[in-house]
């Protein structure tokens, strides 16, 4: 009889041992889920894997966000905490909307190289709400057409899978690299079509931007 009581106590849902056991099972299950998500990408291209974010992405992403070359046209370089917050927001966007900015891997060696993907801007201006295509890659991977390759796949996903009718993008007019990518996506730029980014102080050198868009039927329309 004592043996029976002892066995029951080890399985008692109120016992500390049971709680520890369930936490261990949950943690193991969570790791399996995370591993599955990371190993099963959202999109693949000839050279890229676009997937959900993992913990191992945080350090290289922070290095990238502290690189003055990468952040040339942004308001500031980011601290590790600010960079991690971007990862958290990207994952929150996936949970809320079912899509978001994807972590980008180079297929050749599975190296994390930045992000590419769709998101809903958090600020309000005359062309929002909208869905934006954006990208940010480590400087070592510039000039190889990777941003264009990944962005094309993301735009196609937005139109064909999500059923979007229009996708927008915006950049600082001086950012020639991003403008070239936008042009390759079928977007157009006009110097007259600029706006002040509402999340930056008036007159900030990175505050002036131009938004452009491409419609699902391939007709380019300006959104400025």
Language model features: what each stretch is:
Residues 1-13:
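Extreme N-terminal basic, low-complexity initiation segments
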Residues 8, 20-23, 224:
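Cationic, low-complexity basic patches in intrinsically disordered or flexible, solvent-exposed regions
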Residues 13-14, 22:
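Intrinsically disordered, low-complexity repeat tracts enriched in Pro/Ser/Thr
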Residues 15, 26-73, 101, 105-224:
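Acyl-donor (CoA/ACP) binding surface of acyl/acetyltransferases
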Residues 69-90, 100-102:
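Conserved GNAT-fold acetyl-CoA-binding loop/helix
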Residues 93-97:
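Short loop/turn motifs at secondary-structure junctions and domain boundaries
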């Amino acid at each position: 009889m004592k043996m029976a009581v002892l066995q029951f106590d080890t399985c008692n849902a109120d016992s500390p041992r049971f709680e520890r056991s369930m936490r261990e099972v949950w943690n193991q299950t969570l790791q399996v889920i995370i591993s599955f998500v990371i190993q099963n990408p959202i999109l693949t291209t000839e050279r890229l894997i676009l997937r959900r974010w993992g913990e191992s992405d945080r350090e290289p992403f922070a290095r990238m966000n502290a690189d003055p070359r990468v952040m040339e046209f942004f308001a500031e370089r980011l601290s590790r905490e600010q960079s991690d917050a971007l990862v958290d927001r990207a994952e929150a966007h996936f949970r809320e909307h079912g899509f978001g900015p994807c972590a980008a891997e180079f297929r050749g060696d599975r190296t994390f190289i930045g992000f590419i993907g769709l998101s809903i801007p958090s600020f309000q201006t005359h062309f929002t709400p909208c869905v934006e295509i954006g990208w940010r890659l480590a400087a070592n991977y510039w000039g190889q057409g990777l941003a264009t390759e990944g962005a094309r796949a993301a735009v196609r996903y937005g139109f064909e899978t999500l059923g979007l009718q229009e996708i927008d993008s915006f950049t600082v007019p001086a950012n020639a690299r991003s403008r070239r990518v936008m042009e390759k996506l079928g977007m157009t730029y006009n110097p007259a079509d600029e706006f002040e980014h509402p999340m930056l102080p008036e007159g900030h050198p990175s505050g002036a931007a131009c938004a452009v868009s491409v419609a699902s039927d391939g007709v380019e329309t300006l959104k400025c």
